[in-house]
Regions:
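PEST-like low-complexity, intrinsically disordered acidic/proline/serine-rich tracts
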Residues: 1-281
């Protein structure tokens, strides 16, 4: 499975309501979907009448232009609805408690108030393994006893042992979780647990566990299956599946800290507003 792989696709993560219970599109519908997507992205101007303009220029975004070759109506394949399961009461309670903790404290008191991706630290696991608005390349390197995933987005690196060693003790928690891999025939299986409470994947708790499967089902295609389990967050397990396409191009540097004016400006504006408020008293 070694090589550089392209995760881009315009296929939605969850099945749109208009497709209801349909798991796949016809070839004709795929062509129509791709044409409509291209029309939306072609020279779209920013709407400066809005109170907040887009973070990125449309030319900087690169979702790709192709639907997945499988024709599935969503990347979510389980449950059969193609939709992410509902949150548990515990997950809703955690979200409400987090909201209350932020009351009276602005989201820009400090750089630590901003999320990990805004701070150029990590896009996270398994979020980084899913298609993104840009930087969708994944480089895989293999040795007899390790596999390395180098993600273009946020220059995330995952080094995964294949030698059968046990997982770390549960009190050791990592942003990317603790991954262990093994081969089942021609399929690489990676299981990850021990996520840090600082990780943030769709409200998931430290109980989050994932299983990833990588199988080269064609010379230029890598099948990826992601199973997600956290019974403190979702009412049932759910799975994502999609094919990555081989890329011949290199992965260029992801320079984020060097040009992270967004974080600087957020904090600077917050301090300016606080100063104005003090002066107006």
């Amino acid at each position: 499975i070694q090589g550089v792989w392209d995760k881009r696709t315009i296929t939605p993560l969850e099945r749109p309501a208009r497709f209801e219970n349909r798991a796949f599109l016809s070839p004709e519908e795929i062509l129509e979907y791709e044409a409509a997507s291209a029309e939306r992205e072609d020279g779209r101007p920013l709407d400066f009448s809005r109170t907040s303009i887009s973070v990125h220029d449309p030319d900087d975004l690169d979702y790709g232009s192709r639907y997945v070759t499988t024709g599935q109506t969503s990347l979510v394949v389980e449950p059969s609805s193609g939709r992410i399961p509902a949150y548990t009461e515990a997950a809703d309670k955690r979200a409400e408690e987090a909201r209350k903790m932020r009351e009276g404290r602005g989201p820009a008191d400090s750089w630590i108030d901003r999320n990990l991706s805004e701070r150029c630290l990590t896009w996270g696991v398994p979020q980084g393994m899913l298609p993104q608005p840009y930087n969708n390349n994944l480089k895989i390197l293999q040795t007899p006893d390790h596999v390395m995933f180098y993600l273009e987005m946020a220059h995330d690196v995952r080094i995964i042992p294949l030698d059968g060693r046990p997982h770390l003790p549960e009190n050791l928690r990592l942003w990317h979780g603790d991954s262990r891999g093994h081969w089942e025939g021609d399929t690489l299986v990676v299981r990850t647990k021990n996520f840090s409470p600082k990780s943030n994947f769709r409200r998931a708790n430290v109980a989050l566990e994932t299983e990833e499967r990588f199988r080269r089902n064609a010379e230029d295609q890598l099948e990826y299956i992601l199973k997600i389990k956290d019974d403190t967050t979702w009412v049932s397990e759910w799975s994502v599946s999609y094919p990555m396409e081989r890329s011949d191009g290199p992965i260029y540097e992801f320079a984020c800290h060097e040009g992270n004016y967004g974080l600087l400006n957020i904090l600077s504006v917050a301090r300016t507003l606080e100063k104005q408020e003090r002066e107006n008293k």
